[in-house]
Amino acid sequence: VLSPADKTNVKAAWGKVGAHAGZYGAEALERMFLSFPTTKTYFPHFDLSHGSAZVKGHGKKVAKALSBAVZHLDDMPNALSALSBLHAHKLRVBPVBFKLLNHCLLVTLAABFPSZFTPAVHASVDKFLASVSTVLTSKYR
């Protein structure tokens, strides 16, 4: 459960990402594909090379979902319900892969915002991403 301080930290961190969220989403995806090659199996039809339009496009989708979650911190299950259905029933993404992407998102934010990504912000964003993952995997059962 996110505390009031966590919510403040998440909103502030995501506010820094701002209009460039899609770029950071794509950077995190590229990082994930390089670090955890098994995650590429969900994207056999994508050009996964650095800077590809498909990775950038999916990065925007990831960023949009996270922006929706930030806007609905108190009601993420409803805000992400359709996305949860998609990942559980159609795409059948391994729940572990959400943790891998979360890690890559944290690394991306820490690398791109070193002074703003304090230990407290890191902890709050980590809790937020874990909450998003829990929501996205809730319909697997």
Swiss-Prot record:
UniProt: heme b binding residues: H87
Matches recorded under InterPro entries: Globin (IPR000971), Globin-like_sf (IPR009050), Globin/Proto (IPR012292), Hemoglobin_a-typ (IPR002338), Hemoglobin_oxygen_transport (IPR050056), Hemoglobin_pi (IPR002339)
GO molecular function terms attached to this record: heme binding; iron ion binding; oxygen binding; oxygen carrier activity
CDD domains according to UniProt: Hb-alpha-like
Similarity comment text for this entry: Belongs to the globin family.
Function: Involved in oxygen transport from the lung to the various peripheral tissues.
This protein's name: Hemoglobin subunit alpha-3
Native organism: Pan troglodytes
